[in-house]
């Protein structure tokens, strides 16, 4: 059996639409082994929305690798242990795709390079902002080209933490993408380009005082926040208690605030305030660090029939 741990991720980070993302210390575990025949899939918790057949996203990702290397197992047993909440904007699909590709490559004897796996994952998901940090960890600036992903990985210091607000409702990424306009004004593009560059500079230099300005956005948040009635209240609350910027995590509905000090008092004060505010939804708060490793293998007892 091969066991792989793959992190959650947050994409966009404000102004970096479809090109910036960070891996977070919240994990799914994928256990796979070759069996004599058939496909067996189990999951914990046993969520009925997770396909247990060939439509399962982890299996689909593994099949991409098998097609690429030209080898197929006789059968597969897949066990999924999921901590990453589904359709909350925390990269659950990217974890399935990147983790499935990573696990399948191990089953195939590591035939694919890291660069090849990064490309296959981004191509399958359609953009690299979640899949690349899920694969390699850290904070990633990435662009999907025709046959490769151009990216830069930045190792995030422990000083910068991520206050993740997770609501009690789901939001389809497809739906949240479909509400975006087909065209934007030139001035809004300029607004985002400048702030995305400022964000990269603030992160790499440690000048976190620039983050409140650098996390502003005009490409997606003004449209998507209407799907999240508490968005402005959560963002304003975070800034009030010292966050260095707050933004939608991916397409939402989760919201992330960046904090670089007074972590315990931030958590206590925000939780107390959440209990007293009139909100449309119930929100859970988790303080997470960045994961700088990405997908990792922590157990290999392979009985794969792959011939090296």
From Swiss-Prot:
The record's Gene Ontology biological-process terms are: threonine biosynthetic process
Q: Which cysteines are joined by disulfide bonds?
A: none
Stated EC number for the protein is: 2.7.1.39
The record lists the catalysed reaction(s) as: L-homoserine + ATP = O-phospho-L-homoserine + ADP + H(+)
Positions with a binding annotation for ATP: 85-95
Q: Which GO terms describe its cellular component?
A: cytoplasm
Molecular function GO labels = ATP binding; homoserine kinase activity
> Which InterPro entries does the entry link to?
GHMP_kinase_C_dom, GHMP_kinase_C_sf, GHMP_kinase_N_dom, GHMP_knse_ATP-bd_CS, Homoserine_kinase, Ribosomal_Su5_D2-typ_SF, Ribsml_uS5_D2-typ_fold_subgr
- Known pathway: Amino-acid biosynthesis; L-threonine biosynthesis; L-threonine from L-aspartate: step 4/5
Looking at the keywords, is Amino-acid biosynthesis present?
Answer: yes
- Major place of residence: cytoplasm
| Subcellular location(s) per record | Cytoplasm
The UniProt keywords, alphabetically, are:
Amino-acid biosynthesis, ATP-binding, Cytoplasm, Kinase, Nucleotide-binding, Threonine biosynthesis, Transferase
Q: Does the keyword Amino-acid biosynthesis apply?
A: yes
Pfam (any one): GHMP_kinases_C
Family designation: Belongs to the GHMP kinase family. Homoserine kinase subfamily.
Q: What does this protein do?
A: Catalyzes the ATP-dependent phosphorylation of L-homoserine to L-homoserine phosphate.
Q: What is this protein called?
A: Homoserine kinase
Q: Which organism is it from?
A: Caldicellulosiruptor saccharolyticus (strain ATCC 43494 / DSM 8903 / Tp8T 6331)
Give the taxonomic lineage as stored in the record.
Bacteria, Bacillati, Bacillota, Bacillota incertae sedis, Caldicellulosiruptorales
| The encoding gene | thrB
């Amino acid at each position: 059996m091969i066991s792989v741990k793959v992190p959650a991720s947050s994409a966009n980070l404000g102004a970096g639409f479809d090109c910036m993302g960070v891996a977070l210390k919240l994990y799914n575990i994928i256990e796979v082994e070759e069996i004599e025949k058939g496909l067996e899939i189990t999951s914990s918790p046993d969520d009925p929305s997770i396909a247990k057949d060939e439509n399962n996203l982890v299996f689909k990702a593994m099949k991409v690798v098998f097609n690429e290397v030209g080898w197929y197992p006789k059968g597969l047993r897949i066990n999924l242990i999921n901590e990453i909440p589904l359709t909350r904007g925390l990269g659950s699909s990217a974890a399935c795709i990147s983790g499935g590709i990573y696990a399948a490559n191990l089953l195939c004897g590591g035939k694919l390079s890291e660069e090849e796996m990064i490309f296959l994952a981004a191509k399958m998901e359609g953009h690299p902002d979640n899949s690349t940090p899920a694969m390699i960890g850290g904070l990633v600036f990435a662009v999907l080209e025709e046959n490769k992903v151009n990216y830069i990985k930045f190792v995030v210091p422990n000083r910068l933490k991520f206050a993740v607000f997770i609501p009690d409702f789901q939001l389809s990424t497809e739906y949240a993408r479909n509400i975006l306009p087909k065209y934007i004004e030139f001035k809004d593009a300029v607004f985002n380009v400048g702030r995305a560059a400022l964000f990269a500079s603030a992160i790499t230099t440690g000048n976190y005082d620039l983050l409140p300005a650098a996390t502003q956005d005009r490409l997606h948040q003004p449209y998507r926040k209407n799907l999240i009635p508490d968005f402005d209240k959560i963002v304003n609350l975070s800034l009030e208690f010292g966050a260095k910027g707050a933004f939608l995590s991916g397409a939402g509905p989760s919201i992330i605030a960046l904090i670089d000090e007074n972590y315990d008092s931030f958590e206590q004060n925000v939780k107390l305030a959440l209990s007293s505010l009139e909100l449309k939804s119930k929100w859970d708060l988790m303080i997470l660090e960045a994961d700088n490793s990405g997908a990792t293998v922590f157990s290999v007892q392979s009985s794969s029939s792959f011939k090296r």
